């Protein structure tokens, strides 16, 4: 089954008003694949500005949200605030949230449920550390993360609002990249897990992105893999290289 290409950007704690202006002006003028879904995650303080500046067809995502709608949670952002900025997407469970800020599978699952219940589309992230890969635990780690996500998707219909991102933690910001074959291997076992534990039809439809040091030079080879449906791009999503990645299937 051919699934529509999805290219996600994740600016992390980067960007500025001037960068948004320059970047989106470049993107506006570029010849990009009209058949690709493009969603760019930006810091919370720039959500509204980026949403207003984004070229037509490009969606803006928050990089995180909390599991409840409001309250005494200093520094957090709610789903309603994200929607108030005009945004429809949120990235959840990124490896930096898991390993720097200590977010558990349980908490990420709760965030997924709340975001979906609030009407947002979600990009939940999964992936293993280098030590876990070397210990042969890649599948176990990813399956545990998927279980926490899947049991918090409230209905089969809600899966239409879910795009999974596989990010091998050992390949993020390190310059190391999983080979196309390594990426395909994990994407396939994750899809097979969804087929077994959720639904065969959902497994065929849900898009699974690769998110480990994607660059203009490796995107095309990664994108040829049958179970790699796009990318979640970090550093390269801040640069003109992002245009080449968007055009990976051309």
From Swiss-Prot:
E.C. number(s) listed in UniProt: 5.3.1.1
One Gene Ontology term from the biological process aspect of the record: glyceraldehyde-3-phosphate biosynthetic process
Top-level taxon in the UniProt lineage: Eukaryota
CDD domains documented for this protein: TIM
Catalytic site positions: 94, 167
A GO MF term: triose-phosphate isomerase activity
Pfam families per UniProt: TIM
Cited InterPro entries: Aldolase_TIM, TIM_sf, TrioseP_Isoase_bac/euk, Triosephosphate_isomerase, Triosephosphate_isomerase_AS
Binding site for substrate: 10, 12
Localization per Swiss-Prot or TrEMBL: Cytoplasm
Principal place of residence: cytoplasm
Keywords annotated in UniProt: Cytoplasm, Gluconeogenesis, Glycolysis, Isomerase
Pathway noted in the entry: Carbohydrate biosynthesis; gluconeogenesis; Carbohydrate degradation; glycolysis; D-glyceraldehyde 3-phosphate from glycerone phosphate: step 1/1
Gene Ontology cellular component terms for the protein in this record: cytosol
Catalyzed reactions per annotation: D-glyceraldehyde 3-phosphate = dihydroxyacetone phosphate
Top-level class of the enzyme under EC nomenclature: isomerase
Family as reported in the entry's similarity comment: Belongs to the triosephosphate isomerase family.
Subunit structure: Homodimer.
NCBIfam families given in the database record: tim
Protein name as annotated: Triosephosphate isomerase
Organism per entry: Taenia solium
């Amino acid at each position: 089954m051919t699934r529509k290409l999805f290219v996600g950007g994740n600016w992390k704690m980067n960007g500025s008003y001037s960068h948004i202006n320059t970047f989106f002006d470049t993107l506006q003028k570029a010849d990009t694949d009209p058949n690709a879904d493009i969603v760019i995650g930006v810091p919370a303080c720039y959500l509204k500005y980026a949403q207003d500046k984004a070229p037509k067809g490009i969606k803006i995502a928050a990089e995180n949200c909390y599991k409840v709608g409001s309250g005494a949670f200093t520094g957090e952002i709610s789903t309603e605030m994200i929607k108030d900025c005009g945004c429809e997407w949120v990235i959840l469970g990124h490896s930096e949230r898991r390993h720097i800020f200590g977010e558990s599978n349980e908490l990420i699952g709760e965030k997924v449920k709340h975001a979906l219940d609030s009407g947002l589309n979600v990009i939940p992230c999964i992936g293993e550390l280098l030590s876990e890969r070397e210990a042969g635990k890649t599948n176990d780690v990813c399956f545990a993360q998927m279980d926490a996500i899947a049991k918090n998707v409230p209905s089969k219909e809600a899966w239409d609002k879910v795009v999974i991102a596989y990010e091998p933690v050992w390949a993020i910001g390190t310059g190391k990249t999983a080979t196309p074959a390594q990426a395909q291997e994990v994407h396939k076992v994750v899809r097979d897990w969804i087929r077994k534990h959720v639904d065969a039809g959902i497994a065929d439809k849900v898009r699974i992105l690769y998110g480990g040091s994607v660059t203009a030079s490796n995107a095309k080879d990664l994108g040829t893999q049958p179970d790699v449906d796009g990318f979640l791009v970090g550093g390269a999503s801040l640069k003109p290289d992002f245009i080449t990645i968007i055009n990976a299937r051309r």
